[in-house]
Amino acid sequence: MLPSQSPAIFTVSRLNQTVRLLLEHEMGQVWISGEISNFTQPASGHWYFTLKDDTAQVRCAMFRNSNRRVTFRPQHGQQVLVRANITLYEPRGDYQIIVESMQPAGEGLLQQKYEQLKAKLQTEGLFDLQYKKSLPSPAHCVGVITSKTGAALHDILHVLKRRDPSLPVIIYSTAVQGDDAPGQIVRAIELANKRNECDVLIVGRGGGSLEDLWSFNDERVARAIFASRIPIVSAVGHETDVTIADFVADLRAPTPSAAAEVVSRNQQELLRQVQSTRQRLEMAMDYYLANRTRRFTQIHHRLQQQHPQLRLARQQTMLERLQKRMSFALENQLKRAGQQQQRLTRQLVQQNPQSRIHRAQTRIQQLEYRLAETLRAQLSATRERFGNAVTHLEAVSPLSTLARGYSVTSAADGAVLKQVKQVKVGETLITRLGDGVVISEVSAVTKTRKSRKKTSNP
């Protein structure tokens, strides 16, 4: 009988699943070097092979989506470096690796070292943008760290001469390939910083294989570039070649020629800038001179205006003007006094009582005549309107209608009868004629029918 605190019991499926998850999650992706054997490629396009060394072997699978990126055909017995994930094939419990990438062993080991150093330096922060130094603009002196016999130096000097012939260049000759190259590059960077002769450095070489460029993947070179006080432009190989030095440098140029373009200014552009600056200076000078000339003219004119003789002349002119104004004012005043006297004389004559009485009598006579004429006209118009009104009243008077043979019948209460339905038998009616009134009693009421107008058919 099992104890109450017995360990967990796995099924085979659960055991294989647990082991697979442990391998995939704990091991992750690894680099493995070994010799290929038992290489097969079925119709599916996947690769199946074994990696082995002197004492052990492991089954491998590389699926079609991954192996199509491999640039060579794997051969039996070939040494390779693979990047793979470790897993377990659960149905059989077979431990195997799933290969993601494959390289020949020599180049593969270098690539592995490259990736490891890149990850290490990136973790330390040597690639961070906050440490990148700005390039001087413009550069007053350029230092070049490269081989004095290489094509890279020729390209750099050619571009600098074409763009900015006056820019000083200091060459720090060093090996760029071989075992001694990293140490020489480091010493050249340190020497340039010690002398402090230039304000920007170009570190680089021409293109080549991964082994040829390996000096610029050296950790010592990377740390020397990072420690440099002088900004460094890396120019290693071609545009597709990326080294550790490119990540650490303050700026990466795709080629040595491009690096020379970056640190120099175009001579034609400089000439255009100089011409533009000269034009601006000439315009500023012209404006300044014109402004000073205008100011001088204003001051000169002001001084002339303040001259004593000119002031005396102005005062003399003003005195003469005042005298003329006084004479003119006196003459005007005398003239206005004479005119006032004449006006008063005329008013006095006009105010004579005899003249006023005569004018008043004439005015009274005119008013009496106009009043009599107005009264006669109004009386005639009133008589005419009265006659017209009498004639109109006679024409519309009911008495005139009765005089022509008509009569008006009304009930005892005075209501005029218009229809027989207003009359009842036995009621008293009053009939008004042209020459008197007849009072009668209703003995019968007969209603006449209205005749319909007959229309003829067409």
UniProtKB/Swiss-Prot annotation:
For this protein, the record's CDD domains field holds:
ExoVII_LU_OBF
- Tell me the protein's name: Exodeoxyribonuclease 7 large subunit
Quaternary arrangement and interactors, per the entry? Heterooligomer composed of large and small subunits.
Its job: Bidirectionally degrades single-stranded DNA into large acid-insoluble oligonucleotides, which are then degraded further into small acid-soluble oligonucleotides.
Q: Which PANTHER family match?
A: EXODEOXYRIBONUCLEASE 7 LARGE SUBUNIT
Against Pfam families, the record matches this protein to:
Exonuc_VII_L, tRNA_anti_2
Organism field: Escherichia coli O81 (strain ED1a)
Q: In which compartments does the protein localize? A: Cytoplasm
Q: Which gene encodes it?
A: xseA
The UniProt entry lists the main location of this chain as cytoplasm
Q: Which GO terms describe its biological process?
A: DNA catabolic process
Alphabetically sorted, this entry's keywords are: Cytoplasm, Exonuclease, Hydrolase, Nuclease
Q: Which GO terms describe its molecular function?
A: exodeoxyribonuclease VII activity; nucleic acid binding
Residues annotated as signal peptide:
none
Q: Does the keyword Hydrolase apply?
A: yes
Which family would the database say this protein is a member of? Belongs to the XseA family.
Which reaction is catalysed here? Exonucleolytic cleavage in either 5'- to 3'- or 3'- to 5'-direction to yield nucleoside 5'-phosphates
State the source organism's domain of life: Bacteria
Question: What InterPro entries would the database entry show?
Answer: Exonuc_VII_L (IPR003753), Exonuc_VII_lsu_C (IPR020579), OB-fold_nuc-bd_dom (IPR025824)
**Enzyme Commission designation:** 3.1.11.6
Q: Which GO terms describe its cellular component?
A: cytoplasm; exodeoxyribonuclease VII complex
